[in-house]
Amino acid sequence: MIAELGNYALALSLAVSLMLAIFPLWGAEKGNAQLMALARPMTYGLFASLSIAFAALFYLFAVNDFSVQYIVNNSNTTLPIYYRLSAVWGSHEGSLLLWIWLLAVWSFAVALLSKHLPQEAVARVLGIMGIISVGFVLFVLFTSNPFTRTFPDFPVDGKELNPMLQDVGLIFHPPLLYMGYVGFSVAFAFAIASLMTGKLDSAWARWSRPWTLAAWVFLTLGIVLGSWWAYYELGWGGWWFWDPVENSSFMPWLAGTALIHSLSVTEKRGSFKAWTVLLAILAFSLCLLGTFLVRSGILVSVHAFASDPTRGLYILAYLVVVIGGSLALYAYKGSQIRSRDNAERYSRESMLLLNNILLMTALCVVFLGTLLPLVHKQLGLGSISIGAPFFDQMFLIIMTPFALLLGIGPLVKWRRDQFSAIRTPVVICVFVMLIAGFALPYFLQDKITVSSVLGSMMTVIIALLALYELQQRATHRESFFVGVRKLSRSHWGMMLAHLGVAMTVWGIAFSQNFSVERDVRMKVGESAQIGRYDFKFTGVTDENGPNYIGGKAQIDISKDGQPEASLFAEKRFYTVSRMSMTEAAIAGGLTRDLYVALGEKLEDNSWALRLYYKPFIRWIWIGGLFMALGGLLCMFDRRYRFNVLLKK
């Protein structure tokens, strides 16, 4: 009965989304206020119907209704309740339902929080989001329905959720990532609405920017959590593998970052209009591309869902319609919104333009590096591999000038400026950067590499120029402490985000260059050394869970003879899925991680273990959190705060 309720709710949501896609847009085109007024109630109805469907799937997992095929494939009577509930989005069908429900959440938020906008603008934006919803609801109903019954079979138990996904990271990572993906549909809808009317001004940028920031914050948090999840769950000691599906989330993040900076120019100066619209289209298109890569079956990845060709063809067709249609509209109407003024050679606008060029260069590198091997293979030309060394080298080249721009850009005035105004502080900061770039790796790790020097230089120049810019802004008209308190949330957000980039670069530079890995065979009581750290293997005890059996190894770590930490690494065997999993143990800190992964028991009663020393690796994720916090502060700046907008 509940499964049928979920099906009926999906069918109702299809009908409502079709009406939302037609009537408000028709009303906006004809100037019919009554039809435009239907946009909000239809959006509320779409949200309600999809919420019922989503709640129904939650209930079916909670009670383990094995008459539903999706429950059979992803749950089991031994699976803990918190993993049962998060298994709702643990596979293809449920994750698609999560996608369209989150799309309804974003639509609901736009309808609720945009009462200050003109009725025509709201009708167009919600109508476009209705069109997007139609495509995905059709996809779920006819190719990926999570409510399909098992009849005439009646299984008494299920196959279990993939053990790799039985982790707290699964509870939060996919919803955060999807909130980011789907959130860019709002920026996309605003962009298409502006193309339809041929009007785009500073007010449009001010309406669109908080929604873009919100999507970017969620996507940043999703990527950060996914990277952390891979680090501790997969047992490889790595945090980013340039996997095609990882790249498919990174590409819209790069486009979204460029869009945020471009929107600031459109809002402040009325420039970059056509380029900003194109970036909004690109960001959401890349989100759709990522969906195609994950669900088409053309990838072999720890992230990819097994899928049949029908699903891949549907998404490809949907991709062509949405991207092709939006680009065709852009080609037809783009000239009507194009900016007529040109930025001066040395101005804040030109700095942000260079920023966008470098971000787009990075995006092209990831795009080509990800898709070229796939296209090459699909064309029958054989397999080629583009691995981490290519991406690492290219990003080192791109990030070096980007870091300098990140520091100098906020110091430059809008419209026109002279470099002589900031020459002295920039020269001093560059001088300090050159010294620190060599000194920091040498004094902290006793050796120097090219990439560690460049990484240290990038970190130092971003941080120094950000602090100098803070001092200049705060003391422009007031004393420092008075001026600091008067700075806007947007300014603090910008500074935190830029410092977050510096922290992440620092963590990457040191963890990539100075990590130490050892594969060892150890018997009880034996020790292995990494630098000044001694890892002593004290034995393995049984460690069984509700749906697995396994062993837990204790490793005592000392530094220069003094106790440092005791780690407990596990090896689990999941009895239903017949899979083995490694649960790494980590002693974390701001300056280093000590990481142990337990392998197999060997014939001579020794155990295989993998030991890691990873300096400053946590700065990668701390920097990501700073970026997200910066975006959040910008989003709630006085100009954009939703509670202020609601009062207008």
UniProtKB/Swiss-Prot annotation:
Primary subcellular site in the record, as a coarse category: membrane
Pfam families (UniProt xref): CcmF_C (PF16327), Cytochrom_C_asm (PF01578)
The keyword Ligase belongs to this UniProt entry's keyword annotation: no
Biological process per Gene Ontology, one example term: cytochrome complex assembly
Molecular function terms from GO: heme binding; heme transmembrane transporter activity
Coiled coil: none
GO terms for cellular component: plasma membrane
Location of this chain's protein in the cell: Cell inner membrane
Domain of life: Bacteria
Topology of the protein relative to the lipid bilayer: Multi-pass membrane protein
Transmembrane segments: 8-28, 43-63, 94-114, 122-142, 176-196, 211-231, 274-294, 312-332, 352-372, 394-414, 424-444, 448-468, 490-510, 616-636
Swiss-Prot/TrEMBL keywords: Cell inner membrane, Cell membrane, Cytochrome c-type biogenesis, Membrane, Transmembrane, Transmembrane helix
Function: Required for the biogenesis of c-type cytochromes. Possible subunit of a heme lyase.
Family of this protein: Belongs to the CcmF/CycK/Ccl1/NrfE/CcsA family.
Name of the protein in its database record: Cytochrome c-type biogenesis protein CcmF
Source organism (scientific name): Haemophilus influenzae (strain ATCC 51907 / DSM 11121 / KW20 / Rd)
